[in-house]
Regions:
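Short acidic, gly/pro-rich beta-turn/loop elements at beta-sheet edges
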Residues: 36, 54, 68
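Short, charged, surface-exposed hinge/linker loops at domain edges
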Residues: 2-5, 60-80
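A short, charged, amphipathic alpha-helix used as a generic interaction element across diverse proteins
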Residues: 45-63
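Assembly/interface hotspot detector across virion components, adhesins/toxins, and nucleic-acid enzymes
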Residues: 17, 31, 65-67
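Short N-terminal "domain-start" leader segments
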Residues: 1-25
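A short, exposed loop/beta-hairpin motif centered on an aromatic-Gly-Thr core
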Residues: 31-51
Length: 80
């Protein structure tokens, strides 16, 4: 299973952007990482979309992500 497949299986919309120098950034839409009492944005970067997805997975590993934090549909998920 590729990193993109793993992220897609969460059911959370995935945003993929081309950034400076032809590199790519990947992140979940409307999703933040819980850091104590703060919510921080996180994204993966890489030379390819797959590398960016793998970087994002590494950054989320073992952390609580918060989906739609300011809505009634807010969800907190431990990313394993």
């Amino acid at each position: 299973m590729t990193s993109i497949d793993r992220l897609a299986r969460t059911g959370i919309d995935l945003c993929i952007s081309e950034i400076i120098n032809g590199k790519f950034a990947v992140h979940f839409d409307s999703t933040y990482v819980k850091d104590g009492c703060l919510l921080v944005g996180e994204f993966g970067r890489g030379d390819t979309v797959e590398e960016a997805a793998a970087d994002y997975i590494e950054k989320l590993q073992g952390k609580t992500i918060v989906v739609n934090p300011s809505s009634k549909n807010r969800r907190e998920i431990l990313f394993l």
